[in-house]
């Protein structure tokens, strides 16, 4: 403690000071960090805003501020210091070296295009050329040219340089980074000087030569051999004589020959053409513009011109090499002397020639040569630099210069070039994108499926695949069309088109198998021979029609449409041919054979009415014919179907025809089942075994014709809103009579006659049938069935016992079986137990045990008449009834079980006394005893105990 007491103050003060300064430091750090982060965020946000759309990478957002400032420079290029002070920009893949600094700013503000020897690979040559361009000598020479108009004088004034070397101007472009370019630069200034003098003299005359010289200029750019500069664009006037100097660089022969003649003016125009968008256009411009453009304007060279310059560079280089090096040397010092003053005017021309970005290197040498020609006029003659000077195109020129010569030709050009290197990166991915797209189109789709892959191998091109698919679908179509011609050409054609589209879209490979199969319509058609077949065809466009022909294969053609008689006939013929419709025939026949299998007689009768309705009715009302037809129907169902179809075709109230077969079949099946016992073979055969006739047992009395007529009447009435319901039996005989008489010629007539006969002829047969049907009904209605469950089922009242006790015997047997059943967990037979309540109910014999056990059983029936005893007093106790109503009524069965256990009925009092024992023992045996009245009070007691 002493230590703390002694040092307490110092420790506390130290902690305080440490905390204070620590807090201050942390606060300062936090503030500075916050400020820095905020500043950084703002800067990055500004960067992102500026770079939006240009750069997507997040790293660029965090570029150093130096880069930001550097990127900002392009906007302030003109305000920056002389680019000569800066090192040359990085070389592009096509460039070799940057050595010369030829940029010179014109007083007009135009960025002088420094013709850098770096493009040519010789900084010295480039600088000389720059000086030459800027030299007042060039300016003086064009002035002299303008004044004197003598080309040789101008050449002499220009340092006596032979103008033959002007091809150097074009040469400069190819040697953009080579030493040969340097030589070309040297030769170019020589040529440019005489050319400058020449254009000044012949500038007015150059208009005519520009057309000729324009081609030559193209040759100069492309071949470097033509003397006349093809670009007369600078023929705007004598003012552009310095620009003709630019032209001289374009033409290799612009040298001496051009200088003495008007061709010299053409070289001037040629140089302008380089600056202009196209050599032909510059000629026109020069011709159309006799006056020199202001310096502020810059003439842009055609993108194709620098290319031409590049092509002609080699020729120009050769010519330049031919030119005396002394002249080149003389020109170079002159250029150096006046390069600064003259470059401004001349450089814009180069910038214009440089404007074509496509061939940057080619245009650069051309520009270098042209400034050699044009720079001297800039100092001496501002009108000539006017063309050279046009500044609005200069930014484009600068942009062109950078791709051509990243060196600082003009103050504003270098920063653009430094920034532009990213542009070449953008074009690089573009070809990559183009290449995969072309490959994808040329490549076949990948095989994703086995069948698909095989098809793909067969057909590499996707278009080829599609065509084979179409061919395969077309191949399937012709077969389908043949089917449709047999059935319905129109419907099938529509369906085929749908199938084609589906097959094409879904299936990629070639498939010969027809996938569009509609089995369901077949059964529908069977159900309704004609109309449903049509519906099924509609549902299944292609397969529905083929389904009908198989019926035709049997015999009758599938009716594609009720109204198409000719088609049905053709289908019949095709069906006879048995084409394509076998599977459908397999589906169609079964319903009729089923009818025959049920009752051949009934089916024959059915076939006869159907035939009667179709075509057989008018022609075959006889029974024999009917009998023959049913035999045919099971064998060849198409006949009946064809008859149906023909009948539908002839008499199109098909609705009457279609519905009857189904209700008729049902009625036959039900009647046959009811009257199967009484139907006789001869009756069934002759009368076709109508169920009702068999029921009447009057089939012998009735003629088979009448029986058939009754059936036909039923069929006719059923479709006609069930007219038979009034008297289902009588109408049938009336129709049968008419049909057998042959009075009915059509189904409609038969139905009408049948209705008349039904009203007029309710014969005794119909009443007898109704009586028989009523007599047959009571046996199933036997009321004593519930008593059959009792043990004493044999004691049924004799009234209930009938003559034909087949059903009663069955019920009695069931009850007997129930009486022999043993109860679960008791192994006691109901027969042994005579004391059950149900036994008492069923048996007239009373039993004391039952009476005593009534309360326990829970189902008390006071109306019971047991023999008089003391037990009945116990039976009606009200309390057990209340208890039974509340709890005992549902568990009637479990009450029986305890009696079965003891086999001795306990009186109600005994049950109450032994309720505890019963509940304990019964819980194991019968779970329902829990719900007895005895169990409930126990639960109440438990609740009281809990309280």
From Swiss-Prot:
Top-level taxon in the UniProt lineage: Eukaryota
The keyword Membrane belongs to this UniProt entry's keyword annotation: yes
Compartment(s) where it occurs, according to its Swiss-Prot or TrEMBL record: Membrane raft
Membrane topology: Peripheral membrane protein
Extent of Polar residues compositional bias: 177-255, 354-367, 466-475, 633-644, 763-774
Stretches the record annotates as Disordered: 1-332, 354-810, 824-904
Positions bearing Phosphothreonine: 729, 861
Residue ranges with Acidic residues bias: 59-69
Primary site of residence: membrane
A cellular component annotation (GO) from this entry: membrane raft
InterPro entries xref list: Aim3
Quaternary organization: Interacts with RVS167.
UniProt-recorded name of the protein: Altered inheritance of mitochondria protein 3
Species whose genome carries this gene: Saccharomyces cerevisiae (strain JAY291)
Gene field: AIM3
């Amino acid at each position: 403690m002493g230590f703390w007491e002694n040092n307490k103050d110092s420790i506390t003060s130290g902690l305080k000071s440490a905390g204070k300064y620590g807090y201050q430091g942390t606060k300062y750090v936090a503030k500075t960090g916050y400020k820095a982060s905020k500043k950084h965020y703002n800067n990055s946000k500004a960067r992102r805003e500026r770079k939006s759309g240009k750069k997507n990478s997040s790293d660029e957002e965090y570029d150093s501020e130096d880069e930001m400032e550097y990127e900002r420079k392009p906007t302030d290029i003109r305000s920056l210091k002389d680019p000569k002070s800066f090192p040359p920009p990085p070389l592009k893949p096509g460039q070799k070296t940057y050595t010369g600094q030829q940029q010179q700013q014109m007083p007009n503000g135009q960025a002088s295009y420094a013709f850098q020897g770096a493009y040519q690979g010789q900084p010295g040559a480039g600088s000389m050329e720059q000086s030459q361009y800027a030299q007042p000598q060039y300016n003086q020479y064009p002035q002299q040219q303008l004044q004197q108009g003598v080309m040789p004088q101008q050449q002499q004034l220009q340092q006596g340089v032979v103008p033959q070397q002007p091809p150097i101007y074009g040469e400069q472009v190819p040697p953009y980074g080579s030493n040969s370019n340097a030589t070309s630069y040297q030769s170019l200034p020589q040529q440019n000087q005489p050319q400058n003098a020449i254009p000044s003299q012949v500038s007015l005359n150059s208009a005519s030569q520009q057309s000729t010289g324009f081609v030559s200029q193209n040759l100069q750019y492309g071949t470097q051999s033509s003397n006349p500069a093809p670009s007369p664009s600078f023929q705007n006037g004598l003012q552009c004589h310095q620009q003709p100097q630019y032209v001289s660089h374009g033409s290799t022969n612009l040298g001496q020959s051009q200088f003495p003649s008007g061709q010299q003016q053409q070289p001037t125009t040629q140089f302008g053409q380089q600056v202009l968008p196209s050599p032909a256009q510059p000629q026109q411009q020069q011709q159309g513009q006799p006056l020199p453009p202001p310096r502020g304007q810059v003439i842009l060279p055609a993108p194709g011109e620098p290319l031409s310059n590049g092509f002609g560079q080699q020729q120009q280089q050769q010519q330049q090499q031919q030119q005396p090096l002394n002249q080149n040397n003389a020109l170079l010092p002159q250029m150096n002397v006046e390069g600064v003053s003259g470059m401004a005017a001349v450089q814009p021309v180069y910038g214009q020639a440089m404007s074509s970005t496509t061939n940057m290197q080619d245009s650069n040498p051309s520009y270098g040569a042209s400034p050699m020609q044009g720079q001297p006029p800039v100092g001496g003659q501002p009108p000539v630099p006017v063309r050279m000077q046009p500044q609005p195109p200069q930014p484009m020129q600068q942009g062109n210069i950078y791709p051509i010569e990243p060196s600082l030709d003009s103050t504003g050009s270098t920063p653009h070039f430094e920034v532009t290197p990213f542009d070449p990166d953008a074009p690089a991915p573009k070809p990559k994108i183009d290449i995969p797209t072309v490959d994808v189109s040329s490549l076949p789709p990948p095989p994703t499926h086995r069948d698909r892959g095989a098809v793909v191998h067969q057909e590499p091109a996707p278009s080829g695949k599609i065509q084979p698919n179409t061919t395969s679908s077309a191949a399937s179509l012709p077969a389908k069309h043949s089917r449709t011609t047999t059935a319905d050409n129109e419907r099938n054609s529509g369906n085929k088109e749908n199938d084609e589209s589906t097959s094409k879209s879904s299936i990629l490979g070639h498939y010969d198998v027809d996938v569009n199969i509609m089995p369901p319509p077949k059964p529908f058609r069977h159900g309704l021979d004609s109309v449903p077949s049509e519906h099924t065809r509609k549902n299944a466009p292609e397969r529905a029609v083929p389904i009908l022909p198989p019926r035709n294969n049997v015999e009758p053609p599938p009716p594609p449409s009720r109204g198409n008689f000719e088609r049905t006939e053709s289908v019949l013929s095709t069906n006879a041919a048995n084409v394509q419709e076998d599977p459908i025939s397999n589906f169609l026949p079964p319903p009729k054979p089923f009818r025959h299998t049920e009752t051949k007689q009934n089916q024959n009768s059915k076939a006869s009415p159907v035939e009667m309705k179709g075509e057989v009715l008018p022609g075959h009302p006889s029974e024999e014919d009917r009998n023959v037809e049913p035999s045919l129907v099971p064998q060849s169902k198409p006949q009946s179907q064809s008859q149906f179809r023909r009948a539908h075709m002839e008499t199109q109230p098909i609705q009457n025809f279609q519905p009857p077969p189904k209700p008729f079949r049902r009625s036959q099946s039900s009647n046959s089942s009811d009257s199967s016992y009484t139907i006789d073979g001869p009756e069934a055969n002759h009368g076709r075994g109508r169920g009702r006739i068999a029921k009447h047992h009057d089939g012998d009395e009735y003629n088979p014709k009448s029986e058939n007529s009754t059936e036909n009447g039923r069929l006719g009435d059923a479709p006609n809103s069930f007219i038979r319901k009034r008297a289902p039996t009588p109408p049938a005989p009336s129709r049968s009579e008419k049909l057998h008489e042959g009075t009915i010629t059509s189904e409609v007539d038969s139905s009408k006659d049948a209705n008349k006969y039904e009203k007029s002829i309710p014969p005794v047969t119909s009443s007898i049938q109704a009586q028989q049907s009523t007599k047959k009904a009571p046996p199933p209605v036997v009321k004593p069935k519930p008593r059959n469950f009792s043990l004493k089922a044999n004691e049924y009242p004799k009234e209930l016992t009938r003559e034909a006790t087949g059903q009663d015997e069955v019920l009695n047997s069931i009850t007997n079986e129930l009486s022999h059943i043993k109860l679960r967990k008791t192994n006691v037979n109901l027969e042994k137990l005579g004391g059950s309540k149900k036994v008492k109910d069923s048996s007239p014999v009373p039993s004391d045990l039952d009476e005593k056990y009534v309360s326990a059983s829970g189902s008390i029936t006071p109306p019971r008449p047991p023999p008089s005893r003391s037990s009945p007093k116990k039976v009606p106790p009200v309390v057990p009834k209340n208890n039974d109503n509340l709890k005992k009524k549902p568990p009637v069965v479990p009450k029986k079980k305890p009696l079965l256990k003891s086999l001795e009925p306990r009186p109600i009092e005994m049950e109450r006394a032994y309720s505890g024992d019963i509940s304990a023992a019964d819980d194991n045996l019968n779970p329902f005893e829990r719900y007895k009245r005895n169990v409930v009070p126990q639960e109440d007691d438990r609740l009281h105990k809990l309280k």
